[in-house]
Amino acid sequence: MSELWRRLGFLAFALLVYRIGTHIPIPGINPEQVAALFQQSQGTILEYFNLFSGGALERMSIFALSVVPYISAAIVMQLFSNSLPYLQELKKDGQAGRNKITQYTRYGTVVFALIQSTALTVTLQSAGLIESSSIFGAIVAVLSIVTGTVFLMWLGEQISERGIGNGISLIIATSIITGVPRAFGQALEQTQQGDLNYLILIVLGLLTLIVVALVVFVENAQRKITVNYAQRHQVRGMVQAPSSFLPLKLNMSGVIPAIFASTFLLFPATLSSWFGNIQGLGGLQEFALYLNPGQPLYILIFVILIVSFCYIWRALTFSSNDMAENLKRSGAYIPGIRPGEQTASFIDMILSRLTVFGAFYLSLVCILPLLLINSFGISFYLGGTSVLIVVVVMLDLQRQIQSYVMSQQYASILKNANISGSKKSRRR
């Protein structure tokens, strides 16, 4: 248990470092004008981006881009790893190949961070938010943001290695959680001013609890496929091996499609919002308004992206042919289904149905609360995507802690058994 507490302590320390970093501003930034800009951007995609950065974008800190460049690079690598022969071979090389792909993802993170930080710096300078308008001032700002992004990527990897849980996911969840008190404060302020009815606030609170319960239920639910094993020979005849099952999650893609879809929407919408302030590019500003959360175009694109990423993620991570081949090699079969192609077709049919359900479930959880909250004029900090990410990440953290505790208990039992066995042998 001491090892578990050490890992939890490292996790808490790393997240504390992250929160401190969100308050370190870019050199030469004008905080008053930045605060005024975000005061005017409430309810827009810019505020949504600020949610994923844990308020770092609003403060224009060195973590302003958060882990968005890393997620963008991870998306590109996932897509390329299934289409480029070189990356396909790396995936088959085991741990060495995965390390190489991780290295390429890091390089991609730096590239995306350079592009996004340059766009952000140019926009800040054109709006007069950076005190120095020189090239040197722009270079310092870009390097500060890129360095902060790379450090955040490294911090996430350290959490995964030395702490517990997925580091990048925990950073995103922490960013969202830190915005919850502010969201409640805004809602209470609206009720005190008479802009929001207390009954509506209670309904929204109940809706949030329902969404949390739905996410917990679906993420823990499984579709079990019964699997039998071939009869094995014994001295006194044939004995039927016990049957088992192949567990498949109802939401096979997890929270990945929602995160990827949000990232894809954040990037073009944010660039449109930034560059729309430049003279001659006013049309981009109008386009950015259509991509604000709750707008019909935003909802349409969001649902399309969620459905697309559900199918893409399933194609990248699940292979019905590989599952059927593994069952055949282990002497297992699905009752009533022939091993081989028929088993692969049956599993593929189940996977297709689960993918449809997962896409519908993710779209419902992400979009429906957003529509209701926006219709009441409340900040979308409590949107379905935010709740989904936080709940799924916390469930994953809980599972990893339980698995770690179980493994430590088994190790302790085996150690005690070896000690007692050695003592008995000495007595003899």
What are the roles of these predicted feature ranges?
Residues 2-91, 96-428:
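N-terminal cationic and glycine-rich segments that engage phosphates or anionic surfaces
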